[in-house]
A protein has these predicted regions:
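Positively charged, polyanion-binding regions of nucleic-acid-associated proteins
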Residues: 15-41
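Alpha-solenoid helical-repeat scaffolds
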Residues: 16-20, 39, 57-60, 220, ...
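Charge-enriched amphipathic alpha-helical scaffolds
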Residues: 52-97, 254-257, 261-288
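Extended alpha-helical interaction scaffolds used for oligomerization/partner binding
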Residues: 131, 135-139, 143-342
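Short acidic, hydrophobic short linear motifs in intrinsically disordered regions
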Residues: 39-50, 59-61
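N-terminal leader/presequence-like segments
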Residues: 1-14, 329-345
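Non-catalytic, well-ordered alpha-helical scaffold segments
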Residues: 24-28, 43, 61-64, 227, ...
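Charged low-complexity interaction tracts in eukaryotic proteins
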Residues: 2-15, 19-21, 64-133
Length: 345
């Protein structure tokens, strides 16, 4: 919906009749809903709020009315959308059916809500994680995904990787020189030290005729190589990917293709094993949207919800395994931590 002016929003808040402190508390909760759950209905959000605040602080009708105000308020890292806006065929106008959606689940164009749909599907049947202390929930007013020990270790490891300055085809063969946003070679630089457009991003930019659209995409894609890799890991782990049957092996293959193919990083056996281990640990110890805030290691040591029992290695992983037979054993061990068996070819 179209954002409202500050003056109009001020009048709406005044009409709601709640104190500034209560409005501030609600904004904090909304940030936590977005960061912790990814997507949650206003109805369920009310139940979470009531679990910690009771019913004395705010009436449900005022909670619902607040959702309509913040829906038109610009500058938030989340959106409040009507159910019928996200799902064709829905006609409900009940404000309780609105969805609080983290902005990273909303794309553009035809697949605008693809990640939203995928996340909602994987959330089905799972309870929301509700910590005993309200303070532990409200600690999520900022995105904490890479602030954990496991997240920091992943960032540290990726930050140490260097590019050889060549992009590769799907067979891993060099095809050209990688250039940064200013057209300079990036060979020898670490991932945080250069920004570039990947080949798929370049295709996206060239697809549009509108210069305004092109410029918007250039700004959106103008991230360092490290940021692009972290974004990929974040999206894959939080949502499980767009495909309902996407496996950890497939996600790892896509990550390796990004590192090797688009960013010119050649991993040694030791580095590949380290990456696989960090990926598994980050997955197991993170509060994931697809689990409604639960960590996989809190949901039992059996097979993780939404993950397959078996998978086959893709071309990139097969190549790593062929270089050293021990790599396969290590990869199998890491997958076993997720309750997954690597199938024989």
């Amino acid at each position: 919906m179209k954002p409202l002016s500050p003056k109009t929003l001020e009048k709406m808040y005044a009409g709601l009749g709640i104190s500034a402190d209560t409005a501030d508390l609600l904004h904090r909760y909304w940030l936590c809903f977005s960061n912790l759950y990814g997507v949650i209905s206003v109805r369920d959000a009310w139940n979470v709020f009531r679990n910690y605040e009771g019913t004395g602080l705010l009436h449900k009708k005022d909670f619902l009315a607040f959702s309509g105000i913040v829906q038109r308020e610009p500058g938030h890292p989340y959106a409040v959308i009507e159910l019928k806006e996200a799902y064709a065929g829905e006609t409900t106008e009940d404000p309780a059916d609105r969805l609080i959606v983290n902005g990273r689940l909303i794309g553009s164009g035809y697949g605008k809500f693809a990640l939203l749909y995928a996340t909602v599907e994987k959330q089905a049947g799972k309870p929301y994680w509700l910590p005993e202390r309200k303070e532990d929930l409200l600690a999520n007013t900022e995105d904490r995904f890479f602030l954990s020990r496991e997240g920091k270790e992943m960032v540290h490891f990726l930050s140490s990787l260097r590019t050889d300055g060549r992009y590769r085809n799907y067979e891993g063969k060099p095809e050209g020189t990688l250039l940064d946003l200013d057209g300079r070679p990036v060979a020898g630089k670490r991932l945080p030290e250069f920004a570039l457009y990947t080949r798929s991003e370049q295709v996206d930019i060239e697809y549009f005729k509108s210069e305004a659209k092109k410029e918007g995409l250039r700004r959106e894609y103008a991230k360092t190589a490290l940021e692009k890799v972290l974004d990929r890991i974040f999206t894959d782990l939080q949502t499980g990917g767009v495909l309902p049957d996407r496996s950890p092996g497939m996600s790892m293959q896509i990550l390796l293709d990004l590192l090797c193919g688009d960013l010119g990083v050649s991993l040694t056996k030791a580095q590949a094993e380290r990456l696989i281990g960090l990926y598994a640990e980050l997955n197991n110890r993170s509060r994931l949207w697809l689990n409604r805030g639960w960590r996989p290691d809190e949901m039992g040591r059996g097979r993780r919800p939404g993950l397959p029992e078996r998978l086959s290695a893709g071309p990139g992983l097969k190549k790593l395994m062929e270089q050293d037979p021990g790599a396969r054993a290590e990869f199998e061990r890491r997958l076993a931590d997720l309750g997954i068996v690597l199938e024989e070819d």
